[in-house]
Amino acid sequence: MNFRGVFTAIVTPMQQGCIDEASLRSLVRWQVEAGVSGIVTCGSTGEGATLSLDEQEYVARIAADEAMGRVQIIAGVGSRSTHEALSLCELLRDSGIDGLLVVTPAYNKPTAKGLERHFLTVAENTNLPICLYNVPSRTGVDLQPDSVALLAEHERIVAIKEATGSLVRATQLRANCPADFALLTGDDPTTLPFMAQGGDGCISVVSNVAPAEMLQMLASISAGQLARAGELHQQLTPLAEALFAESNPIPVKTACAWLGLISSAELRMPLSPLSQSAADQLANALSQLGRSFERSASPASSLGPGEVPDRQQAEASTLEFDLNDGVEQ
C-alpha cells in the first residue's frame, strides 16, 4: 500500500434514496483513466456519515470491483463509537479494498488517550493498512502530533490525512513521524504549501472534477517546477473556493452531475441542494477552468438508507474484537 500521490475522495451517486451503481462504476472508471493514485469511498465527500454500514461496504466493494487493481481503493471508516468502527471493518474484510481511512470519532470528544486507544484497537482488529483522518472542523476533536507519532509506531498505521489546513501542523508531523509515514493533506486550498512542508500527497475533493490538473500540480512539485505548480494552484483556486462555498459535498456533487459524471446530484438528508448563489459561483468556476457542462436543478434530498443488493449481513451484537491494544489504562 502506497499512500502517496493524488487520491480522490469520490462522491457517492444516488438515485431515489439508493446507491446508483451504474454512476458509481462510471465515476470510478473515469478516475482510473485520469491516472489518480487511489480512490477514497464514503469519507466526508462520500457522505459516509449518512450511509448505513451495509451501504458503505457496498460502495467500497463496487469501487474495488470496478477498479480491478488499477488504482488503490481506500474505504472510509467513520463512527461515533469504536465498536461501530470495528463492525464496519469486519464488513469490509472481504470487499477487495486496499486500505482504510479511519477518522477520529465524532461528537464524544475523547481525550488524547481515548483517541490513541480507538485507533490502536482498530489496527489490532484488521489486516489492512490504516490512514488516520484528522478533521476537527467536523468531528470536534483534534488528533495532536504527539498522538500521531505514537500511533505511527504501529505497523498497520502508515499515513494520516491532515485536514486542519495548518501548515505548522504539517511541519510538526514531518518532524515527529518516521520518514516512511505518509502525510496527506485533506485541505485542497493548501495542497501546494503542504507539499512544500514535506507532504506526500493529497486526498482531494477538487480531483472529482479536475483530476488532470491536480496530478499535474503534484508532478510539478515533485519535479521542482514550483512556478508551474503555482500556476496550476492559481487556476484551481476559484474551483476550490466554489466547491467549499457550502458544506462539502453539496457543491462537488452538483458539479459532477452538471459535468455528466454521475446521473444525479441527489444528496442524503440532512444535506440539502445547492443554493442559487453558490450554484452561480460554481458555474463561473467551471467556466474559468474551461469545462463544458449543463446546469440543472438539483433533486430533493432523500431520506435513505436504501436497500443494498447482495447485502452482507453481520450482527454487531455477536462480533468479538481484541481490545488488548497495548495502551496503558
PLM region spans:
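Low-complexity, intrinsically disordered or signal/transmembrane-proximal segments
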Residues: 312-313, 329
